[in-house]
Amino acid sequence: MNRKKQAQTELSYYGLYLLHHLRENRFPQANDADFIRERADHAAEVYEQARRDALFADAAQELAMAALLKGLRFSKYSILYDVVDSEFPLEVAVEDQEAFVNHLLPLVDNVYSIYDLTDDNFAQSPDYDQLYTELTGAVALFIESNGVQ
């Protein structure tokens, strides 16, 4: 068994959940085994402490998941994907969205520079709406100039 596959099979529930989340949303930490293990261990500790404090399993799980995903709710990829999916369904076919977003992401990376995507409440802030609008404009300009490649 290769090292990567072995490391995956050794991950806890929280580690596997986090790895899936990081990969699905294209976070750079997806390749950082130490980061994943530390976060997973911390989430397990939060769960255990919450249970010792007499919280119900559901409440303990909620606290553990919050600790696991702290600062990892919003990725550049997932926000841009949402923009393309929601605002450009006629221009970019569903089967082309992932490739289109992957192509476009480095071109619009500077748009994200003034926003704190690690804020777990970012989606409820006016900044989220502003970022969404800026990305929508950037995508529209790209499509107008280059089409959908």
Regions found by a protein language model. Give the residues of each.
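C-terminal alpha-helical interaction appendages
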Residues: M1-Q149
